Swiss-Prot record:
Membrane topology: Multi-pass membrane protein
Lineage, broadest ranks: Eukaryota, Metazoa, Chordata, Craniata, Vertebrata
Protein family: Belongs to the complex I subunit 4 family.
Molecular function via GO: NADH dehydrogenase (ubiquinone) activity; ubiquinone binding
Function (record text): Core subunit of the mitochondrial membrane respiratory chain NADH dehydrogenase (Complex I) that is believed to belong to the minimal assembly required for catalysis. Complex I functions in the transfer of electrons from NADH to the respiratory chain. The immediate electron acceptor for the enzyme is believed to be ubiquinone.
Name assigned to this protein: NADH-ubiquinone oxidoreductase chain 4
Keywords: Electron transport, Membrane, Mitochondrion, NAD, Respiratory chain, Translocase, Transmembrane, Transmembrane helix, Transport, Ubiquinone
Top enzyme category: translocase
Subcellular location: Mitochondrion membrane
């Protein structure tokens, strides 16, 4: 069910990050070198999840692996136990909660009209659902973490914290963000661009679907304008 996917991506997946934050408070803060294997493992897991996204043909699976890759960055930022790392992790968890939930909602909107989640079979929707294409563009840009969104703030804080802790981590972070941009653009182009299937009879988007997207993006934009609420 789409509601379960939205709750899982937006709330339940972030409970793991919250649990790690609480556990790190009782661990020694001066011996972060002992956590180096876990940080490398988290960043490597994020890269592998991003590479898995590139080879996905199922729209819902692609969005799910995207959530896993972002949580890898969150775990790495939490483990180094710095104020910037914790602030970036909190910002990225909240921002990606809204973004991934919105992407699952859009995937369901597409599935209800095409009855398939295969990327190549959902192409050409910009000709018949232009407003939905606008929502797809906005959510994909937020998934890429362009400024001035909260996603960008979180990733910038995480990148700065990890770079100050160990400069070589910038290689893995940069590679992860490059692949994130690649699969996000691939997802948008595969579902929206191209010729429209001739036998595809769809109905226009409803006000309920637009309201769902507004309720996802407006709070995220408001938090982006005043990040002091969570950082």
């Amino acid at each position: 069910p789409i509601a379960g996917s939205m709750v899982l991506a937006a709330i339940l997946l972030k409970l793991g990050g919250y649990g790690i934050i609480r556990m790190m408070q009782i661990l020694p803060t001066t011996k972060t070198d002992m956590f180096l294997p876990f940080i490398v493992l988290a960043l490597w897991g994020a890269i592998l999840a991003n590479l898995t996204c590139l080879q996905q043909t199922d729209l819902k699976s692609l969005i799910a692996y995207s959530s896993i890759s972002h949580m890898g960055l969150v775990v790495a930022a939490i483990i180094i136990q710095t104020p910037w790392g914790l602030s970036g992790a909190m910002a990225l968890m909240i921002a990606h909660g809204f973004t991934s939930s919105a992407l699952f909602c859009l995937a369901n909107t597409t599935y209800e009209r095409t009855h398939t989640r295969i990327l190549i079979l959902t192409r050409g929707l910009h000709n018949i659902l232009p407003m939905a294409t606008t929502w797809w563009l906005l959510t994909n840009l937020m998934n890429i973490a362009i400024p001035p969104t909260m996603n960008f703030t979180g990733e910038l804080l995480i990148m700065s914290a990890l770079f100050n802790w160990c400069p070589t981590t910038i290689i893995m972070l940069g590679l992860s963000m490059l692949i994130t941009a690649s699969y996000s653009l691939h997802m948008f182009l595969s579902t929206q661009m191209g010729p429209t299937p001739l036998n595809n009879q769809t109905e226009p988007t409803h006000s309920r679907e637009h309201l769902l997207m507004i309720l996802h993006l407006i709070p995220l934009m408001m938090i982006s304008m005043k990040p002091e609420l969570i950082i």
